Amino acid sequence: VQLAHGVGEHAGRYAELIAALVADGYSVYADDHRGHGRTGMKQHGGDVSKLGRLGPGGMNATVAALWQFTQLIRDENPNLPLVLIGHSWGSFLSQMLLNDHPEAYDAVVLSGTALRWPGSMNGGDLNAPWKGKDSSGLEWLSRDPAVAQQFKDDPLTTEVPLLKLFGVIEAAKLFGRPRKHLGRD
């Protein structure tokens, strides 16, 4: 299983899922994407204020790095099926990978996703439905307040919105059309 996390977070936030999959006999690979988590801290010289920023090459370099990770997984496990799980921004990256390399994955699971067409993705305030005087701003993340608190307390996450992190040009690269005639079961 290859795991692609969402924007502003990191692979470590999926520790429970990874542990459950490993307990069921799966091998799990999860990286911190460019600008995120420990990768982001190293990339930005430990500057936590820059977490989430992709750096040189932007979105294209991020997708290329994720593809390189897929190839490493395939090289280490040539006879095993590969399932790609992408959440939120990771689901958009997964859609991009699937468009370019459909043969590389035996199955794909998209969570918290949308069609990558203008009008299908919400570029606005994801917390708008829960706005109120007592809202934390992270209600969109989970129905469990403890999950929002863990995110807020995690020094390797950022609440900076995607458009501010990436800028309009890089964020626009998330748009695309699904490739026709992808295999399906």
Q: What are the language-model segments listed below?
A:
Residues H5-E9, S88:
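Active-site glycine-rich loops that stabilize anionic/oxyanionic intermediates
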Residues A11-R13, I18-V48:
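Conserved alpha/beta-hydrolase
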Residues L51-D75:
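Alpha/beta-hydrolase active-site loop
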Residues N77-S88:
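Alpha/beta-hydrolase fold nucleophile elbow
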Residues S91-P102:
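Short glycine-enriched nucleophile-adjacent loop
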Residues V109-P118:
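Active-site nucleophile loop of the alpha/beta-hydrolase fold
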Residues S142-D185:
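Serine-hydrolase catalytic core
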